C-alpha cells in the first residue's frame, strides 16, 4: 500500500477544507491555528522555536494555495485503484491495519470537514467503543480537537492535548497567582518555576496520557446522550451564524460532560482529585458561562473535600442542559431555525467570550 500517496491525498483534502473555511475564524483564532499547523507540518512541538521569517514565508504560500483551492470539492481517496469516501474512516482504517497509523475524519465547528492521519500508539476497548490514541500526526487541518467520535471509534490525539497543556502552563507562568491551573500541574509534578527541559517535556507527555481520560469520557457521554441527535444535527446544519452555533455546541458539550456516562461522573465515582483539578483548569469561556454552578461546587470541595458538592452540581448542570436541548428541539419543530435563534438570544444574553 502506498502510504505516502494516501497521506498526500488526505493532506490535500485538509488544505481544501482550510481554504473553504478559514474565513469563519476570528483573526486571533486563525493565527493561533495557523501557527499550530505550521508546527505540525514541520514536525515541531508547541515549545519548539519557529523562525519568524520561515513562518511568514509559509503563511504567504499557504494563503496563495487557499486562493487556488477555495472552490475545489473534497477528493475521494484512491487506494489500489479503488476510490473511498474521505469520511469513510472505517474502510480506510481497515486498509491501514498493520501500518501503525490511524485515519480520522468528521465535521468540526461551522460544519468544517476535518481530517488527520496519526501514529497509533495505543488502542483499547471501552464499553461499546474502540478508543484509539494517536501520537505524532502526519497531516491534519486547521481544526484539531483533543478527541473526536466517529462511528464506534473514539480518537484521542495526544499531540493536541500536549499543546493544550503547554498553553495552560504558559498562561499560568504569566500570572502572579496560578490558581487552579497551578494546583493541577502540582498534582503531576510540574511547578510554576520549572524551566523547559527534557524532564519537563516528559512530564507534559505523562500528564497528557493521564488527562486524556477526561476527553475520552466526554466522547462517551456524547455518544450515550443521543436523544434527538438527528434533529440536533439538522439544527446545526441550518444554523448560519457563529453565535448560535457556539451555544448549540456548548449545550451539547455540557450534556456530555454531566451525563452519567461523562467525565464528571467518572471523576467523582473514582474520587480522582488530580482529574477534577484538570477538568476545572480546562473549563473556560462559554463552558464556564453555561455551567456556573460547578465553580461554587468546586470551591466547596476545596474547602471540605466532600465530593457531594461536585455530584450535586453535575446533576443540576445536566438537568439544565437537557432543558435547553428540549426547548431547542421543540422550537425547531414548531418554528424552524428562526425560532431557535430567537430563543438562544433571549436565553443566553451574553455573547460568547471564546475566539473560534
Task: Enumerate the language-model features and the residues they cover.
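N-terminal low-structure segments adjacent to metalloprotease catalytic domains
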Residues: 1-128, 199, 353-356
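Active-site scaffold of zinc-dependent metalloenzymes
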Residues: 141-208
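Long, well-structured alpha-helical subdomains associated
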Residues: 51-54, 60, 261-354
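An active-site-proximal "capping" alpha-helix that borders the catalytic cofactor pocket
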Residues: 249-265
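Post-HEXXH active-site segment of zinc metalloproteases
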Residues: 223-252
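Short, charged/polar micro-motifs that form catalytic or ligand-binding hotspots
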Residues: 202-214, 242-253
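Short linear interaction motifs
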Residues: 118-144, 195-197
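Active-site recognition of the HExxH zinc-binding catalytic motif
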Residues: 210-227
